[in-house]
A protein has these predicted regions:
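A glycine-/small-polar-enriched, mobile loop at the entrance of the PLP active site in fold-type I
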Residues: 1-58
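Active-site phosphate-binding strand-loop segment of PLP-dependent enzymes
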Residues: 112-167
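PLP-dependent enzyme catalytic core of the Aspartate aminotransferase-like
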Residues: 1, 322, 326-357
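Conserved beta-loop-alpha segment that forms the PLP phosphate-binding cup at the N-terminus of a helix
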Residues: 51-80, 84, 88-92
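Conserved active-site segment immediately N-terminal to the catalytic lysine
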Residues: 174-186
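Conserved PLP-binding catalytic core of the aspartate aminotransferase-like
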Residues: 280-311
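Active-site C-terminal subdomain of aminotransferase-like
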Residues: 10-11, 186-270
Length: 357
């Protein structure tokens, strides 16, 4: 099975081999050393400040999205939330659940956030900004420099979900003034699902320490304290953390985050050039290297997903809700090659020849 979804993705042989090993006991000096290296490499690849901290949460990306909303914002805040799709809507829901005062900036599907969209909120006393850097459901990559400039001018705390864009697109946490970054194990880290990662700068750490969170599992004060000794407050997904360590070391050996950015850019451009004569419309006006969102001109997007899965042994990423029949997505994350792109494109051409596209 060839996997072009946006998570889980194709893992390297080294990472998969660790998944076959016996999971070790983790309250040891050896595991603590691995976790401390995980923290440092995550900070290095996110280009975070030396005094930033990394927290590993056993849970999906949504677990860390919720932990961030709970720990860095309070009812005294006034937060702007960009909603350009399913995951922007999730931040809106989290603010509603935790009673964080917020204003939703609602975007049409596939459209980027613009300076004009932000203009009405200049100087209006907002204290927080929540953004999915790459709205994975629609394939839109937002202009993080523009958002950073807006937050800097208005003295706004900036929390960024980089779950699908981390390692795929250029990102410099320190230079952009991002206070919190979130990512997950199953995207470009190319490991099994189960771990989400939060990187916090000193301002975010101050907010966490001052906030009285009504949660045991999601209180980041405990996670930060335990992280000082390379541990977690509760039993983590030990095997996945060991796989993350192998993957981070793999990235380091292969030239670091810039090489990963370039590799995924090459894969995305290669795929997009190979499908230019097929009956698809790319629906995003501002794309990430992580994924290509496609609208079939003559067929159901979900039917294409099923045909590729059942008849060709290829997974692409379907959409849900209103977009299920309209858009499917092709990911460029993980252990893929231009030859894999050709295999997918040949399958699509075969479907076209059979009148299925």
């Amino acid at each position: 099975m060839l996997n072009f979804t946006v998570g889980p993705v194709m893992a390297s042989d080294e990472v998969r081999a660790i998944g076959a090993e016996q999971v070790p006991y983790f309250r040891t000096a050896e595991f603590s050393a691995i976790m401390k290296e995980n923290e440092q490499l995550m900070k290095q690849f996110a280009k975070a400040s030396d005094d930033a901290r990394t927290v590993f949460i056993t849970g999906s990306g949504t677990a860390s999205m919720e932990a961030v909303v709970m720990n860095v914002f309070t009812p005294a805040d006034k937060v702007l939330v960009v909603n350009g799709g399913s995951f922007g809507h999730r931040f809106v829901q989290l603010c509603e659940i935790h009673e964080i005062p917020h204003t939703e900036i609602k975007l049409e599907m596939g459209t980027p956030l613009t300076a004009e969209d932000l203009k009405p909120y200049e100087g209006q006393g907002y204290t927080g900004f929540l953004i999915n850097l790459h709205e994975t459901s629609t394939g839109v990559l937002y202009d993080i420099q523009m958002i950073s400039d807006f937050c800097h001018r208005n003295h706004i705390f900036l929390a960024v979900d980089s779950i699908s864009s981390f390692l795929a697109d250029p990102f410099n946490m320190k230079e952009l003034g991002v206070n919190v970054m979130i990512t997950g194990s199953q995207k470009a880290l190319a490991c099994p699902p189960g771990i989400s990662v939060i990187i916090l700068d000193t301002e975010a750490i101050k907010r966490v320490e001052a906030n009285n969170v009504k949660s045991m599992y999601f209180d980041l004060k405990d996670a930060l304290k335990n992280g000082e000794r390379g541990q977690t407050p509760f039993t983590p997904a030990v095997g996945t953390l060991l796989q993350i360590h192998a993957r981070l070391k793999e990235i380091e050996r292969n030239g670091g985050v810039e090489s990963e950015n370039q590799r995924m850019k090459m894969l995305a451009e290669d795929f997009r050039s190979k499908i230019k004569d097929l009956p698809f419309t790319i629906v995003s006006k501002s794309m990430s290297n992580a994924v290509t969102p496609l609208h079939p001109q003559n067929a159901s997007a979900y039917d294409i997903f099923l045909k590729l899965k059942d008849e060709y042994g290829i997974w692409v990423c379907p959409n849900g809700g209103d977009m299920a029949e309209k858009v499917f997505r092709v990911g460029h994350l993980g252990n893929l090659s231009p030859e894999d792109n050709t295999t997918l494109v040949d399958a699509l051409k075969d479907m076209q020849a059979k009148g299925l596209l």
